[in-house]
Amino acid sequence: MAVSIYDSLRTPGPKHYKYKICDGIDLGDGLVIDPLNLDSLVVYAKNVKWSSFCDYGVPLYLAADTMDTPYEYPPIIMNDWRWFIFNDHYFGKYWGYGLYTILMVYSTIFVITVALTVLSFLTVNKGPYKITSLLLKLSSVLASTSIIYFLTSALSTISRQQEHYGVANGNVFGTLLNSNLVIATLNLLSMFFYKLCQVSIVARLFERKLEWRIVVFVGGIMSIVSFIISAIVSYTDRVGIRNDNLVTLSPFGLLFDIALETCFAFIIVTNVWGTRKTWVSHLQMWYLALLTIAIVLLSPAMFLADVGTGLLSAYAATVSPLLYTMSTFVAWEWLERIHILKKAAQVKSLLGQKIYEDEQEGYNFAYYSVNNESNLDTNSDSHISLYNDMFRNSEQFSNVGSNLSSKESSSLPAQMNSTGISFPTAVNQVEFQKRKSFLDHLTNFTYSRPYKIYKKSKSIIQLRKRNSETVKNERSNEELSIEKVRRRLGLTNERREYVYNTKDIVFASDDDTESECESNNILNESIDSHFPENGAGSV
């Protein structure tokens, strides 16, 4: 298989060197040896002229490693070859964009992308972040599908070229990437979903709801803007639309993506450094921390290198999804591991998870306090000492129940009533019942009503489920009892054969009757012995 030195994926510039072997070389008279033709193995020829197979004025060289031959190449061919391997061309040396080099690069990208896709399905758990895990898996599948479709199409085209021309040109990869709409669409969708996953990962670092909403709002808008810019640049180039106003859009989109990736890398690295006390005692977390820092910094570093030297422009359409896949997956894995360590530390502590009071307004914490205000211990010594400390230096010591109703005064402890201290409110009253604005009522209704409906529907479903299970259990118990009785009576015998055991049954009433009869007979015999029938008149 031969490789063209014109196998650059970039747009060629002006040619600075003209290869003479493409115009032909006069070899003169001599013998022509053709080992494949046995009939005319050696032929004498005159005025032999030889020209190399060239592609757009650039010769094709054999890419295979052949054995050393004692024959020497003509000086013209050697000069062209030296120019090919030692001099820079339009945008760099062509050897870096040879066919085998490109195949090795894309094969590596394919293996890494597919492996990370499989790992995302095996290791990424849903948990409380179902949407994020779904987006991560979907974007991984799209990236894998894109690279598989790209390699399949490119290799089939190279195979046809080899069969038809006897050579293969690496321009197939660049042409396919710059013209195929399917690959462009898959790459755009995968990178957009990866950016949304990165926004969700950054939002997980903030515990407060307000900060979480700000991150999601700003990050979501930035991701959508980046997606729109990338879509415009990609589709205008592939469809063939030329607009002078869109010339600066492509570099602006690239710089915008670099800024987003730099922010993401900075936040992840800051989190790794900020949580070092949590993972510093675990050896595996050391490896994961170093890997996370290296990979999240790799994306902006590669993009910046591409801007400065054009390093990735030939592979940008496939390297960019790979970099997003690696950084997103590793950052997700880091957060999962550090979250487990934090939860383990919170379980050991007394306080547990943090609760912010301003976030609980209108939520369960406030409702719990209001519903349990009657459970406060108003007769405890702590309340008495608290109120004594509050009003020790106050003028309210001289007021004797002027602000309390009879019902509120009766609810006070006996020790406090005897001191003559008056309070503006009841002891066990929690002051949540302040006058609220219409916006507060509307916000409270918006947040509380769906929660109440959810709780009510959940209780109804649980009650119906419990009732159905109870009825089912009762029916099963009743059927079991009937079956047991039928089995004891022999009613389950299909052959209608019944065997009974005979047994004397003695009832308790029969035993009592026999004992009473025996006692009566004994009593009559004793009476007859003392009072004979004919001796009554002698008494």
Curated annotation (Swiss-Prot):
Extracellular topological segments: 1-101, 152-172, 235-248, 306-310
Compartments, record wording: Cell membrane
Mode of membrane association: Multi-pass membrane protein
Function: Required for the proteolytic cleavage of the transcription factor RIM101 in response to alkaline ambient pH.
Record-linked Pfam families: PalH
Main location: membrane
PANTHER family hit by this protein: PH-RESPONSE REGULATOR PROTEIN PALH/RIM21, PH-RESPONSE REGULATOR PROTEIN PALH_RIM21
Cytoplasmic topological intervals: 123-130, 194-213, 270-284, 332-539
Alphabetic keyword roster: Cell membrane, Membrane, Transmembrane, Transmembrane helix
Membrane-spanning intervals of the chain: 102-122, 131-151, 173-193, 214-234, 249-269, 285-305, 311-331
GO biological process: cellular response to pH
Leader sequence residues: none
One of the record's GO cellular component terms: plasma membrane
Family named by the database record: Belongs to the palH/RIM21 family.
Species this protein is from: Candida glabrata (strain ATCC 2001 / BCRC 20586 / JCM 3761 / NBRC 0622 / NRRL Y-65 / CBS 138)
Protein name: pH-response regulator protein palH/RIM21
